[in-house]
Curated annotation (Swiss-Prot):
Keywords noted in UniProt: Cell inner membrane, Cell membrane, Membrane, Transmembrane, Transmembrane helix, Transport
Periplasmic side: 37-432
Family: Belongs to the membrane fusion protein (MFP) (TC 8.A.1) family.
Principal cellular location given in the protein's record: membrane
Source organism (scientific name): Pseudomonas aeruginosa (strain ATCC 15692 / DSM 22644 / CIP 104116 / JCM 14847 / LMG 12228 / 1C / PRS 101 / PAO1)
InterPro entries: MFP (IPR050739), Secretion_HlyD_CS (IPR006144), T1SS_HlyD (IPR010129)
Protein name: Alkaline protease secretion protein AprE
Biological role: Involved in the secretion of alkaline protease.
Amino acid sequence: MTRTVKRDENAYARLGWLLVLFGFGGALLWAAFAPLDQGVAVPATVIISGQRKSVQHPLGGVVKHILVRDGQHVEAGEPLIRMEPTQARANVDSLLNRYANARLNQARLQAEYDGRRTLEMPAGLAEQAPLPTLGERLELQRQLLHSRQTALANELSALRANIEGLRAQLEGLRQTEGNQRLQQRLLNSQLSGARDLAEEGYMPRNQLLEQERQLAEVNARLSESSGRFGQIRQSIAEAQMRIAQREEEYRKEVNGQLAETQVNARTLWEELSSARYELRHAEIRAPVSGYVAGLKVFTDGGVIGPGELLMYIVPNSDSLEVEGQLAVNLVDRIHSGLPVEMLFTAFNQSKTPRVTGEVTMVSADRLLDEQNKQPYYALRAQVDAAAMGKLKGLQIRPGMAVQVFVRTGERSLLNYLFKPLFDRAHVALAEN
């Protein structure tokens, strides 16, 4: 019986040793051949995919209402801050009225210069300056056009009437001259016979002298008429010249006013465009959809300067990126395209899943941390689109901590354990 018990004990011992041997051998084989993920752990933080947008006001002014707060989500184009618009609106209204008057005045002067008697609304003015009194202003310009053209016409008509009067005088003078020349011929005929009679004694000497005196008077009147002809013709020429000069003066005057008005209208349009730009910016709107961050204005009625930074808008993004600092001695093992696993340590570890992604960028040169003065390479990784669904319901904000594990390959447990020893031994054997 004692032999039987001893034999059983030896059998159990051998079985135990076999189990230990097989277990150790299996563990050794697993450690030698089973693949384990090889990688690099990098602490990182969530960053904005794309840059945050600065919100500024180009002109500055007085804040009327602040419509948002830090952390508030806004849509693109949504009002953020409302500026006091009173001065800008008054400036627009004033310039609008002046511009409308300048354009209507320009149209009236152009009609005067062209000699047109009708005046139409300038093209595009109703859209550029939609004023309720635009029609009344156009009618006033029509009345001014008519009155100025009438005044000029009356002035020229008076000059033409003077010319007609001079021409009538000229015609009367021609008739008088004709009569005088007829009288001259008759007197010459009478004198030729009277001189013969007087020489023969048939006619008194004093009667001959009377006829000669009459002829001399007729000749004097003819000479006077000839001089009068020249004066009247000169007066007609001067009157015609005055008409031409007045018309030329009028055109020059209108042309000068027209050029001045055109310049004034262009200047006013530029000023109006600038004033409208200022009025449009009385409401500062979100450039993109996202979250308000870094709000720097807190008081209604406060004054902000031109170009002053008011807040940032952190854009919404369909992608999620993280950025970390990669140790300098590990940069040779990391490159773009490597798969990563990310763990958002700001959330409950038991409920937050690991999400997959890939390395999108490793900086080309090393950088220096301003706080600890340690060199590093910037590493960026992006969450896969398929993995974004795992983060639904979680509010991911820029700056949150993330643990990133970059998978660089596979190796065995024995390689993990003995490679540092082999590397050290290789260095030690190489030393002199």
